[in-house]
């Protein structure tokens, strides 16, 4: 199938209805394809294991080999499939997961790997997954930001990739730090609603006059930012995890990742289209086994709690959960007891809507040095994410009259993973 030209079943009407906030956004034509109406809104939760989790200590253990490390492999709820003993709770719900053991990104670099992971591209300037999904799943009654990224306070660098590219400011990720509400959501008591409404009318009229004869995109960017802030002020309670029960705080874990996932659940329940939660400190160039015991203990418990809650609330069937870092870690153990960057053979997982649960796709060789079968590229995963969410990944953006594929046309969805 020609991924660029395959458009059967879609009417030509405005897919991009929102104002854009960058110069390039002015070139997005309304002549693009609308997504089909869905009975329930699809949502995306990206659990990002920042730094690159070791596949040997998580999804693809190699016990008893020179690359395997000290940990055992344990049985799971999928007969014949084993994962690391560092994920004992996850082993009990493997029948809910879709695991890919054959990712070959060949990008052993944090920043480049993170961008390629999120955009499915190696060329800069394309929207990352959260921004693309926020746009492509946008509904007329959405008023909250479509993409919210949650992280702890700390190093930024590659962890803050959230570029909407040519989609504009409306689809940039809103960043939440330490599960706290964005600053200044509470209006001063002296500001009365009737005054705010009057100021809004004056502002919009002034904007319209100012835009005459000028490039309107920078002005639109300010307006979009203002409207998003106004929407957040009206729904500031969705960020307040103190409203969650003490037992929920305990179940999710008192660490940053646990509390941030608790907030993510609230945001998804409130209708946010895409939420990303970053779990830090997987970049174990030294003392890899010590650090993975700590990180896996946090991740294991919180992941299972979150998936169970989403399932019990009937949300998992409409939410795609993606669990991945930007790379894997070397089979070789260095002289500091660490594992270094590795992009040639690593693992990730998914759960929820649109993917087949209880399967393991692809494999690596005995030492985990190379992909043995069913190699997967990051572009393939990007197509697969979109398809799982009910989005035709062969659609095009239309920019200045030229088509620009939503997903890399050199890649394709992994049909065997799709439900």
Model-derived features: where do they sit?
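Ligand-binding pockets and gating/stacking loops
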Residues: 1-419
């Amino acid at each position: 199938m020609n991924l660029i030209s395959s458009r059967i079943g879609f009417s030509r009407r405005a897919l991009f209805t929102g104002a854009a906030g960058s110069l390039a956004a002015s070139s997005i034509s309304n002549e693009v394809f609308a997504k089909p109406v869905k009975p329930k809104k699809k949502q995306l939760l990206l659990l990002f294991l920042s730094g690159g989790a070791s596949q040997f200590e998580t999804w693809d253990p190699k016990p008893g080999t020179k690359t395997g490390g000290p940990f055992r492999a344990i049985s799971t709820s999928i007969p014949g499939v084993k994962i690391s003993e560092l994920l004992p709770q996850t082993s009990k719900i493997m029948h809910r997961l879709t695991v890919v053991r054959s990712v070959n990104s060949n990008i052993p670099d944090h920043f480049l790997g993170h961008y390629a992971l999120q955009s499915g591209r190696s060329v800069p300037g394309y929207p990352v997954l959260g921004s693309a999904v926020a746009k492509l799943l946008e509904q007329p009654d959405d008023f909250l930001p479509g993409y919210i990224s949650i992280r702890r306070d700390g190093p930024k660098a590659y962890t803050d990739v959230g570029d909407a590219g040519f989609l504009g400011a409306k689809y940039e990720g809103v960043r939440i730090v330490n599960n706290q509400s964005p600053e200044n959501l509470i209006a001063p008591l002296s500001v009365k609603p009737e005054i705010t409404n009057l100021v809004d009318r004056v502002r919009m009229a002034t904007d319209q006059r100012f835009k005459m004869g000028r490039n309107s995109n920078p002005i639109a960017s300010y307006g979009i930012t203002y409207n998003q802030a106004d929407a957040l002020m009206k729904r500031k309670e969705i960020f307040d995890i103190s409203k969650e029960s003490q037992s929920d705080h305990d179940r999710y874990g008192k660490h940053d990742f646990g509390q941030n996932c608790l907030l993510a659940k609230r945001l998804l329940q409130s209708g946010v289209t895409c939420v990303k939660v970053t779990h830090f400190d997987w970049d174990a160039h030294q003392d890899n086994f010590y650090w993975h015991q700590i990180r896996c203990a946090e991740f294991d418990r919180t992941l299972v709690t979150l998936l169970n809650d989403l399932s019990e609330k009937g949300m998992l069937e409409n939410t795609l959960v993606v669990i991945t870092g930007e790379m894997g870690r070397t089979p070789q153990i260095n002289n500091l007891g660490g594992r270094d960057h590795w992009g040639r053979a690593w693992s990730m997982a998914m759960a929820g809507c649109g993917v087949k649960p209880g399967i393991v796709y692809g494999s690596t060789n005995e030492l985990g040095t190379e992909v043995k079968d069913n190699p997967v590229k990051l572009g393939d995963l990007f197509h697969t994410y979109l398809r799982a969410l009910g989005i035709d990944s062969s659609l095009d953006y239309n920019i200045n009259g030229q088509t620009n594929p939503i997903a890399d046309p050199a890649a394709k969805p992994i049909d065997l993973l799709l439900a």
